[in-house]
């Protein structure tokens, strides 16, 4: 563990001689980010304790998140963390990000390895609705249902991850995934994974991720404890409200034919 310092700001990171590129886990909010981070942490040299939150807190004074050059300089610095004034290691602290992958620029393959996780929008928006209602600041609109949230235009602090304005949160969610899909075509260092694959075929999915990204598995993959997740407010949703959600998603998802088939097939 090292107290990594850059431009006067410091934060705790782990480093390892056994990794050569940082690992980023990226997603739209509430898509299983911590699930995959903690899963990888339990069976590889990468660790989620501590992880690095790629966000304005703690990095707002260090990075222009909308500058490819600024991001490149920062991520390159994570490949050369000095230990004991002599040894340089790459960080093995997993980088958590909700920014769209396009902001990594054309050099993404040389900057880091990326796991992009996506999830059934019904599950995403139930969780996101509870998450936004949890905070005492304006992270986003505190509405009466996830259906209202999907229909609402993005507001509050949640807008910090956007490169453009969106008609509603559903369009924002779909666009985030479509950007990742486009970026994956240009880099062998980006792997997309469906949350349901981790739920239903955990070990095989983790092995596939690690094989594609050339990450060494050092222990048998095992699911992390639920206590390690971040929960939203305890809110209840009726069966009728869930059915209205499904109907809305079934109609809206047709507007984004390039979404992964395993998402579209859920609402045929």
Model-derived features: where do they sit?
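Conserved phosphate-donor/acceptor-positioning beta-strand/loop module used by diverse small-molecule
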Residues: 110-130
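PAPS/PAP-binding and catalytic site of the sulfotransferase fold
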Residues: 32-46, 192-217
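PAPS-dependent sulfotransferases, especially Golgi type II membrane carbohydrate sulfotransferases
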Residues: 1-23, 133-136, 146-147, 155-167, ...
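Short glycine-/polar-rich loops that comprise or flank the Walker A/P-loop
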Residues: 109-113, 186-190
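Conserved nucleotide-binding/hydrolysis micro-motifs of P-loop NTPases
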Residues: 101, 120-124, 198-199
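Glycine-rich phosphate-binding loop used to anchor ATP phosphates in small-molecule kinases
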Residues: 84-104
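PAPS-dependent sulfotransferase catalytic core
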Residues: 1-87, 225-229
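Short His-Asn-centered micro-motif
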Residues: 25-28, 95-98, 117-119, 194-195
């Amino acid at each position: 563990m090292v107290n990594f310092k850059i431009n006067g700001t410091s934060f705790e990171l782990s480093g390892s001689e056994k990794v050569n590129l940082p690992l980023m886990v990226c997603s739209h909010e509430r898509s299983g980010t911590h699930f995959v981070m903690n899963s990888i942490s339990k069976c590889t040299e990468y660790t989620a304790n501590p992880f690095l939150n790629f966000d304005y807190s703690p990095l707002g004074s260090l990075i222009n998140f909308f500058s490819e050059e600024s991001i490149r300089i920062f991520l390159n610095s994570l490949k050369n963390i000095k230990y004991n004034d002599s040894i340089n290691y790459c960080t093995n602290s997993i980088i958590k990000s909700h920014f769209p992958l396009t902001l990594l620029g054309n050099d993404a393959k040389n900057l880091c390895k990326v796991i992009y996780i996506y999830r059934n929008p019904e599950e995403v928006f139930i969780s996101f609705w509870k998450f936004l209602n949890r905070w005492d600041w304006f992270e986003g609109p505190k509405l009466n249902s996830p259906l209202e949230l999907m229909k609402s235009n993005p507001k509050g602090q949640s807008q910090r991850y956007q490169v453009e304005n969106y008609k509603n949160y559903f369009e924002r969610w779909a666009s985030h995934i479509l950007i990742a899909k486009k970026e994956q075509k240009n880099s062998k260092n980006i792997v997309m994974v469906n949350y349901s694959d981790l739920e239903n075929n955990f070990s095989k999915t983790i092995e596939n991720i690690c094989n594609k990204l050339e990450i060494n598995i050092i222990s048998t993959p095992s699911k992390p404890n639920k206590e390690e997740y971040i929960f939203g407010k305890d809110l209840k949703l009726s069966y009728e409200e869930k059915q209205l959600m499904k109907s809305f998603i079934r109609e809206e998802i047709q507007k984004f034919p390039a979404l992964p088939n395993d998402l579209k097939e859920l609402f045929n």
